Amino acid sequence: MFKKLLTLLLITTLFVVISCQSSHNPNEAKYKAAYVAVNGIMDSGNIDELDTYIAADAVDHQMDPSITTKTGLAGIKEVFTYYHRIFPDLKTTVYSMAVSGDTLFGYISSTGTASEPFMGMPAGTSQTMNAVDVVVFKDDKMVEHWGFMDMSDVMKMMQSNMAGESKIEDKGK
C-alpha cells in the first residue's frame, strides 16, 4: 500500500513539474526585455539601437502618415525622432507585461512636456498618455505593433487644446 501511494505521489509530482515546464514560454523574458528597451529608446532618442529589437520590415499599425510616409523600421525611427523632439523629457513607465506565444501585451504610461506647439497645445504643456501595446515577435524581433491609447487621456488632451475656444459658434449674430 505504501509503495503504491509513494508511486502515485511521485507520478503526480512529475506530471506537475512537466506540465509547468511545458507551459513556460522560453522567449518570455527576452520579449519583455526587448519591450522595455524599446520604450527606453523612445525616451532617450537613441534610435540606432532600434535595429537590435525591430525588424527592418516591421509593420506599425499606429503609424501617423502626417509624421512620415516611410514604412518599416525607417518609418518607426522617424516617428521616434519626432516624438523625442516634441517631448525631450519623455518618461515611459512599463506597468505590466504579459506574453502569449509570440505576442506581448504591455500597459504603459508616458509623460512629457511639449518643447514646441503640438496638436494645438502650446509649448510647455505637460501631457500624460496611458496606452496598451500589442507586439508580435518573429525571429526575436518585433514585426508588428498596435497601440491603443486611453480615451480619457485623449479627451483631456483635446479639451486642453480647446481651452478658450467656443465649442458652439453662433453664426447668426
Predicted regions and their residues:
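Positively charged n-region of N-terminal signal peptides that target proteins for export
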Residues: 1-5
